[in-house]
Amino acid sequence: MASGLTANKKLRHKITAAALLVTLGVVYGDIGTSPLYVMKSIVAGNGGMGHFDTDFLVGSVSLIFWTLLIITTVKYVLIALRADNNGEGGIFALYTLVRQRARWLVLPAMVGGAALLADGMLTPAVTVTTAIEGLKGVHINGNILIDNQQQVIWVTILIITFLFFIQRFGTDLIGKAFGPIMFVWFTFLGVAGFIALSKDWSMLRALNPYYALHLLVSPDNKMGLFILGSIFLATTGAEALYSDMGHVGRGNIYLSWPYVNICLVLNYFGQAVWLDQNSKVTAFNKITDFNPFFQMLPESIRLGAIILATLAAIIASQALISGSYTLVSEAIKLRFLPRLHIIYPTRLKGQLYIPVVNTILWLACLAIIGYFKTSAEMEGAYGLAITITMLMTTLLLYQYLRSRHAPAVIAIGTLIFFSAIETVFFISSAVKFLHGGYVTAMIAFIILAVMYVWQYGGRIRDDNTYRAEMASLFAYKNQLSELRNDPDYPTYTTNLVYMTQIANDHYIKKEILYSILDKRPKRARVYWFVTVNVTDEPYTAEYTTDTYGTDYMVNVQLYLGFRMEQQVNVFLRQIVNDMMREGELPTQPQKYTTIPDRQVGDWTFVLLHEELSPQTQIKGFQKAIIQARLRLQHIAVSPAQWFGLEYADTIDETVPLVLGKIPITKLNRLTRSQAEAQPEDEDD
């Protein structure tokens, strides 16, 4: 394969102290802020202070410990991280590894991706709100900083708005502080938990899974199986951990996770000890938004802890926002979503900004804050969607293990074991549907509907148009040669480029040749037919060329990774210079130019736009899908922007999209006398 492009292959992530700090700031934001609300949700669900005993607390932290161990450590850290696509992780990267096994696997990939995006909209709202609620009642110089929930809402809205506003400028500068701050945060979690745990080491008996299982059937547990809906909040960040692997590397996650896990477990156990020792203090029930995380801290450090928690919540939110951009970008490259305008605000690999996604996330967060108002209400909706994502990931992991020829007993055992556990979590979280979960379910359904329309609509179009009239470039080689040398036609451009798909090396849609020869003969020195092939590897940057034995026709096949910018204009200029250097194309010296000794002429790109033809003859449902897909194109970025042609000379031409078998109506020619003999329509 000829390759003149500099391949931006995956970076080999070195394991260093700096890299481990970056990992703490990028990967663990979501799971690292869970101690802010997990025990709070468990206690509130059981009736509040005074409505639980020691066995209840032991069973609760036992469930948390084993959930973190089984779901986060075993499934994601030990198994899923090995299912990487050239270093990239996440449900879409996993899908690209297995999609050749069965066409239907696109469904779990889309369902899981839609649910993950929906749940990500709730994370910034719930984490920041929980942190700010800790300021209620806190005195500074004798004054109460925040004394009501309305003030909490406004402060949260200001923080969220600021966070989304700065996305357009890139987060490289503040991102450098994320790692150290999260290191301090996790250390604080561990130390605070250890101090509280040291007052009653007997809480460590919760490491025995017996207490976890016993709690599920204990009469002390007023929630029954549904307590798992709160327990699950401790591991919601596991999917994000897998998705962010490409930013930091598997090795850095392997080394940093034990420290993070220990700090989290210590804090959960410490909160349980404090709750056990203060369970009879019913006065705590009078505290609005009672949170054991903050209450177990000495009054002297509580304000500092709240500030640190707020910073951690902001970092967690930033990680979810960046993760959403990456997820949408991958969905676009996989043709699950329309092409959207993507901006790369810094030179940092993988850092991108999608304006329309940023606006939607911001408005969704504000709507969620305004609708639910308190973190307790948000917790009721949180986690439902992510259980669906985890189930879909388990299904794809099974397919991955089978594709790697893992023993059937291991692959099937993995599927059954994790599916059973996650199904129980899903059932226990289903009650959240009535308590706000319908919000994330509705958002996930809308995202899934858009994905389905775009993906299935594209499939309908491809299935119906691949049989469309195709033409061989060989059959028109002579005409193109004559046209480029015909003095009767003015030179249209030096290099004429069509973005297309070439089948069997030399067949293209006849509408392209119609554009060149019939619509308006376009005389050029070189005719370029460019195909962009998105590969399953994230950072492929390669190409092939075929001139068909001429020096005026070039078939360019670009192979770009699903995370690569499609800067066709830039790539073509390198390709033409490579070909001239190899003697495959003659130079194109320019008489008038600002560039000394310029050897490449001007370029014109012809972009063909499709509009559904009235002649389309397909089933009603399929036609509705196609029409919906064409409407979605209005929110999509223009082909010129998508292919990096914003500053190039582009020509837009509209072509009819005809699907299905075209009915042919034959007219009968009448003589004048026959026409005069036709009965005339009478006026009403």
From Swiss-Prot:
It is a multi-pass membrane protein. Its main location: membrane. The keyword Transmembrane applies. InterPro entries: K+_transporter, K_trans_C, K_trans_N, Kup. One of its GO terms (cellular component) is plasma membrane. The chain crosses the membrane at residues 19-39, 61-81, 104-124, 151-171, 177-197, 223-243, 255-275, 303-323, 352-372, 381-401, 407-427, 433-453. Pfam families: K_trans, K_trans_C. It is found in: Cell membrane. Keywords: Cell membrane, Ion transport, Membrane, Potassium, Potassium transport, Symport, Transmembrane, Transmembrane helix, Transport. It catalyses: K(+)(in) + H(+)(in) = K(+)(out) + H(+)(out). One of its GO terms (molecular function) is symporter activity. Transport of potassium into the cell. Likely operates as a K(+):H(+) symporter. Belongs to the HAK/KUP transporter (TC 2.A.72) family. HAMAP family: Kup. This is Probable potassium transport system protein Kup. The gene is kup.
